[in-house]
Amino acid sequence: MSATDLASLEKTIEAAFDNRDNVNMSTKGEVRDAVEAALNLLDEGKARVAERGADGVWTVNQWLKKAVLLSFRLNDMQVVKGGSGNSTWWDKVPSKFENWGENQFRASGFRAVPNCVVRRSAYIAPNAILMPSFVNLGAYVGEGTMVDTWATVGSCAQIGKHVHLSGGVGIGGVLEPMQAGPTIIEDNCFIGARSEVVEGCIIREGSVLGMGVYIGKSTKIVDRATGEVMYGEVPPYSVVVAGSMASANATMANGLPAPHLYCAVIVKRVDEQTRSKTGINELLRD
């Protein structure tokens, strides 16, 4: 699709979103066609909710998020087939794999293990592996990435190339508020089991999160070497574990020591060469 066509599509969706109270299941024509076209672009990886520039800055294509939201107003509930024992579901969003056969799976180039769930408009790149997991609409999963068992990739989340999302990992989805950016895991990251990254936070390239690390916008991310405290973004090639910090007030009103509060701790930073040659377990050793 040309830049002119994309601009026209964006204009139509922006206008429809501004007038969304009048968009419903009976809406036909240009608006419905534009939303369908946008969802197809997302589904095929030809457009992304967020894109990383050469300077490392992520730009959010809000109009694509708006297209996803408009689709809920346009589409009725329907039976979704494919459940265990010929059971069905009841939803507005069909499976990405609806009506797929061998040819479509071979062309896609990724592995989809039984009981993984991918909703339409999520893109899965070649050589990715989906264990029994959940990938929500508008998400992007990069080439060679492993989405392990019971991991969840939220709506519009952006997962880079050669990422490992370990068992039970949760990557938060962000559709609303509209101005919020999606949660982003950049290339070559390892996210340890049962960790959570939410609220539009960014884990920069090559970083390693140990098991059970929770990062949201209000989570303190502390560099142990410098004492620097940051929020919302883990720097490139950081090794991060769960920790705690002393409270600002050393004691409570009753005189007892104040409880320490959770934080994420950067225990070390490594360069790209070290990261590529060093095992994950070795990096996480103190």
From Swiss-Prot:
Positions of substrate binding: 111, 148
Keyword Transferase: yes
PROSITE patterns found in the cross-reference section: HEXAPEP_TRANSFERASES
Keywords: Acyltransferase, Amino-acid biosynthesis, Cytoplasm, Diaminopimelate biosynthesis, Lysine biosynthesis, Repeat, Transferase
GO CC annotations, alphabetized: cytoplasm
Alphabetized GO MF terms: 2,3,4,5-tetrahydropyridine-2,6-dicarboxylate N-succinyltransferase activity
EC class of the enzyme, as a word: transferase
Pathway: Amino-acid biosynthesis; L-lysine biosynthesis via DAP pathway; LL-2,6-diaminopimelate from (S)-tetrahydrodipicolinate (succinylase route): step 1/3
Subcellular location: Cytoplasm
NCBIfam families, sorted: dapD, PRK11830.1
Family: Belongs to the transferase hexapeptide repeat family.
Name assigned to this protein: 2,3,4,5-tetrahydropyridine-2,6-dicarboxylate N-succinyltransferase
Name of the gene this protein is made from: dapD
